[in-house]
Amino acid sequence: LDVIRPADINETEAAWRLAVESKTRPTALILTRQNLPQLENSSFEGVQKGAYVVYTPSKKANIQLIATGSEVFLCIAASKILEEKEIYAEVVSMPSWNRFVILPPEEKEKVLHLPYDARVSVEMGSTFGWGGIAKYNIGIDEFGASGKAEDLLEHFGFTPIQIAGKISSFFKE
């Protein structure tokens, strides 16, 4: 099963195309109902590979934030907050973990070029599986809740300020 969780309309179009063109395995598209903005550099090739860099900080990155779907935008906002603390976070959109992990090592290293200890995954779901990609994982390892989106983001620690705070605590030194 090829699971794809796109972050914007371009990634969604690419995911749909890949699903329709696939002759060897089924595809699950995990879409949001949120009205999300458009990434500046989303690409078919990035979705095809499973992951690619979508945001570069103002100075050389010393950490990478890896996210899927709507969390990509939360990571971009958190990255901008982190710059004030001199933590420079590059953001990677990983719409398809399945596609990414089967790439040759040299292709994976082009995307995840920083050391394992400098990577953080951000996923509004289980952190299960992310340990193979990132040392630090921000997720929800409990049952969800019902309510307004803004209230739930705050409750589970997924506002950009809360994400930036967690990341800062990982890299205190």
What is each of the regions a protein language model found here?
Residues 1-2:
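Mobile "lid/hinge" segments at catalytic clefts and subdomain interfaces of large enzymes
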Residues 5:
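A short helix-loop
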